[in-house]
Every structure is written in structure tokens, then in C-alpha cells.
């Protein structure tokens, strides 16, 4: 990693990336976050919670006990801390502080990757979706969903680039409100941005407003939608596109005042998909590709739930839960920075696993192992062309070139 002190331990380097001392001190000073805190300052809290998420700790006592590890204690300059102190601190840090830190870190990732140069033909894609996380209603009364069930919704916008995705914005709500209630908070209004979301955000009045304000979107239409076809556009019969048309949606008072573009295609299993958009400068095939990228936000939710432990929370208040979610996004951005700055081309999961295995070693050793090329290369399992082998053997026999039959080293697979 260029410009980094590789003599430090991987643990030290990770904590420094997480806390970004200059930026964090500036924000803490502006918001007065650490003003009366003596022991567990924000940079240490960030490091502890991030480590707990990466290592899949189950509770506050396990976080507190990890300081018995001399390497962790030394890296944090913290001998011990009580579990209740971690709980109070996590619940008291202003969420605005962590949100601001996340947004600045996200912008740094975007600058490092150079998204404007990697977005390619389809343009600047922003994927929008939500994921519900179940909670125990007796412990999280503020997140009551049903009488016997609690939960929250994590509404998220992520930005697509060639190598993957970067989280862009998050809104946390109780699980009850519909997805479309958070559309205005997540939709990007810049003219070069395309917002991609699923059928849960279908709202004709909202779509008319987006058309008025030249906000671009691509979504999926529900099966029971009322459609009035105005113009049928030409479709390449050799493509996967079945229909491309200009339509009006709804009827009577619910009829949209702006026409939209309707594209019909199929998924990999042959099921019909109807895509709705106000984008006019991309082909139907390109717009189908745009909507296929929406799956990446599902994979992102799965990744952070499995590998950053956002299904289990260390605090019970809404502020503690939201703070932990922001720390998970901050941790993800730090992993993206490590991947980009090190030049590693493998998956983020492989990088994370090696990072955890090398925490107590030097950062230079971690980089060496991360970028090490395999000593042996395998051709894998080969699919044999039995017809070709038979034809070749038959030809040799017919021309009486049969000496090979007495050769114990002969291999008919090597032609």
C-alpha cells in the first residue's frame, strides 16, 4: 500500500484507517463529541465495534474481554473498559457525527477508485433498496412491527463501479413504513445519475414529479398495472427484448401525465420482466443491463449481514442501533480502501479473511501474502472430447500406426 508505514502491525494499520485521526479530530472538535470523555474516545469506540463486527463477537462482554489481548490493548492504548461503558458510549455518540464521517470516507473511496472513469457506457448508476432486520420486540419497543415482532428497515443507496459497489447513503426506519416513503431521501437528482429500484417503490405521482424535474429512474412494473400503449418501437428479433414501447400508466385520476418507456424481456429462467423508465438515450438492451445491476444491492445486504454482523446489535436504543449500522458502513469503506490501495484484484471476502488471519503480524507481511501469486497453477478438471479421441485413435489403427499400443506412457487425452 503506497504511502503507508508497513513496519506497523496489521491491527495498528486497520485502526488508523478506521479512525482517520485528522478527519475524526476535526469532526469531534466541531461537534464537541469527546469534550468530557476521559477514556473511551470516539476513535477507540470505532475500532472496538469494527473489530467486534469483523470478528463476529456476540456481545459487549466479549468486546470488553478482547482487551486482554496485549496486541489489541497496545494498538488502542487502552488497558481495559467495562461493557456498560461501551454500551453507554455507543448509545450517546451523535449519529450525525458517524454519518458525516461515513460520507467523507465514502467520498474518499470514490475519489480513489475514480468512478467517473469507470462507469462506462451505462453511466452513473445508483441502486436503491431496503432490507428488514428482525428484532426482539420486548427489547426494542421503539421498533415494534407487529404485536409480537419488532424490526427495522435499512434503506440504502449504493453506487456501482466496475469492481463492485460503494455504499452512498443510509436511512434507518422502523420496519412498518413502506419503502416508497423514503424515495425522496434516497433518489439522486443530478442529471447524469440513473436511479434503479424495484417494484416496492412504485408511485405514479412521484414518477410524474421525477419527469418534471428530469430525474432519471429505472424500475420494474407490477403485473396488474394498467397500461395504454402509445407507440411501439422497433425491436431486434435476435435480442432478448420482446417489446419496447412508449406508454401511459393508470387511468382516470390515477393516470400519469408523462409517458414512460416500457421494455419487456426475460430473466435467466424465462420469466417475463417488465422494465419501466424515463431514460431515452439508452437502447432497450442497455436498459435491461441497467436493471440487472439491481441485484448487486441484494448481494451487498447479504455481505454486510453475514460478515459485519448487522443482524445482531450491541445496544437497544434506536441511536445505538443506527450508530452500529454506520460503523459497519465505515468498516466496509475501509476494506474497499485497503483493496484499492494495495492493488489486490481478488474478492473483498478473501481480503477480509486474510486480514483477520494476519491481524497480529506486520502490515508488510499481510501485503506480501495478499499479493502473493500462487506457486502452482492448475488446469482444473478437463472436459474430454471423447469423439475426437476415438477419431484420432481409429485413424492411427487404420493407418497401421499401432506402435503406441505397446507404449505404457501413451495417453490418448494428450493429442
Feature roles, as predicted:
Residues 1-62, 66, 79, 90-93, ...:
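Single, function-defining residue in the core of a domain
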Residues 143-147:
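Extracellular beta-strand-rich solenoid/capping regions of secreted or surface-exposed proteins
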Residues 67-76:
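Extended, structured, electrostatic nucleic-acid-contact surfaces
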